[in-house]
Amino acid sequence: MYAIIETGGKQYRVQEGDTLFVEKLDANQGDIVTIDSVLAVSKDGNLTVGAPMVAGAKVEAKVLEQGKAKKIIIFKYKPKKDYRRKQGHRQPYTKLVIEKINA
């Protein structure tokens, strides 16, 4: 059994027990979050596709950690003009483990 969910503007194919990194969610470590935006569910070989969401389907996930990804460096410059800008960015993420798929 698997489901296709949407969170943070991205879509993920998940099964029970999967671990995934998603865009930061407003939840504490150890909390259970419910994801209602389920686009499709496959159960016993039958695929149910929503229009746009599957009615009554939910995915429950546990928050393992909140963190920041590796730092990326943004460096802009204009040659011969003495213009240089260096900026760093670390994208926040939430690490989830899928507990249950209700369909």
UniProtKB/Swiss-Prot annotation:
Top-level taxon of the source organism: Bacteria
Cited Pfam families: Ribosomal_L21p
GO-annotated biological processes: translation
PROSITE patterns: RIBOSOMAL_L21
UniProt entry keywords in alphabetical sequence: Ribonucleoprotein, Ribosomal protein, RNA-binding, rRNA-binding
Gene Ontology MF term list: rRNA binding; structural constituent of ribosome
Any one annotated GO CC term: ribosome
Keyword presence, Membrane: no
Subunit structure: Part of the 50S ribosomal subunit. Contacts protein L20.
Functional description taken from the UniProt entry: This protein binds to 23S rRNA in the presence of protein L20.
Family: Belongs to the bacterial ribosomal protein bL21 family.
Protein name: Large ribosomal subunit protein bL21
Highest classification ranks of the organism: Bacteria, Bacillati, Bacillota, Clostridia, Peptostreptococcales
GN (gene name): rplU
